[in-house]
Amino acid sequence: MNITEFAQYAGVSKAAVSRYFNGGYLSAEKRAQIETAVEATGYRPSMQAQMLRTRRTRQVGVILPKLSSDSCPRMVEGIGSVLEESGYQLLLINTANDTKKELQALDTLRQHTVDGIILIAALYTPEHKTLLEHLHVPIVTLGQNFPGCCSVYHDDAGAAQAATAHMLAKGRRAPGYIGVTLLDKCAGQQRRAGFEAALKAAGLPLHPERMAVAKFSQESGYEQAAKLLERSPHIDCLFCATDAIALGAMQYCREHSIRIPEDVMIASVGDSKVGRNAFVPLTSAHLHYKTAGRDAAALLMELLADPHTVPRSQMLGFELVCRESTND
C-alpha cells in the first residue's frame, strides 16, 4: 500500500498523512482517522522515502562503554524514553571499555547517517578530540564534560569529596584511595580531586603511597586493595572511585579478617544495587543516571531542532547514601 492508497482508505489528504508521520500539526479528528487506519492496515511510510524527503533518518546512535554496568542501562533507559516521545529510534553500540572500538563506533555512526549521537564516553584522548572536531554530526557527551561539546555530566568531585569527608568526620585519619586512570576526566581526575579536597579541608597531608589506580572491575579493586593494605596496613578508611572497585576491596577485607567498618571504613560513588545489597551495605554517592540520560537526549533534540545551538554543559547533583560500611 502506498501513501495515496492509504490516504484514500483513511479519508484524509496525502498532506495530512505526511504531517502525521513527520510529527506535524493535525486536528484531533484527522489524527484519530489516521490512527484507526494505521491499526487496520499496519501501514508505515518508506524509511528511504522519508530520508530522501527530509534528509533525516529519525535514528540516534548511542555509544556506551559497558552494557553490563549498573549505570549504563539506567542512562540508556532515560535516553530511550525521550527518543520514543520524539519519534526517534535508538541504535546501540557497546564498546566493552575499548577506546579503539569507541572511536570506530563514532566513525561508523557518522557514515551510517544517523541524525545525532549520544556518547557515553569512558575516556577523553587526543584521538577523541580530533574525531569530535571533524564529526559534523550533532553530538552530546554523557558522563564526561568534553570541551566544545554539549555535555551532561555529574558532580564527580563533589561526590568524592562528600564521601571522603563523611569518613573523616567520624574520626578516621589515615585515608586511602583507589581510583581509575586520569584519562577518565570524571571518574579519574574529578573524583581524585574531590578526595584530595576532603583531605585538605580536614588538614590532612596527601600520602601517595596510600593511593592506587584500578581498572573498572571488582577483580581489579580486589588486587589493588591487596597491594595498598599490605603496603599501608594502618589505613583506616578507603575511598574507591566506583562501587565495583569498592566491592573488590570489601571482598579482600573479608578474606583477610579486616573488619568493615571497625578497622576500615569504605565509601564510593555509584549507589549500585550490588553495593546496596553487599555483605556490608556500601556507603555511596547516588548519581542520577536515568535523569542524565533524559537530559542528554533532550539536549540532542534541541541540537537537531537548531544546529546553531551554542554548546553548553549541564552538571547534575548527587546524594550521599550512608550505610553500614561507614558505621551508619
Predicted features, each with a name:
Residues 152-177, 193-197, 218-226, 246, ...:
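Hydrophobic alpha-helical segments within soluble ligand-binding/sensing domains
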Residues 163-204, 312-325:
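An alpha-beta-alpha
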Residues 1-58:
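N-terminal helix-turn-helix DNA-binding module of bacterial transcription factors
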Residues 43-116, 193-196, 207, 237:
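Amphipathic helical "hinge" segments at domain boundaries
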Residues 114-120, 176-179, 211, 232-242, ...:
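Periplasmic-binding protein-like
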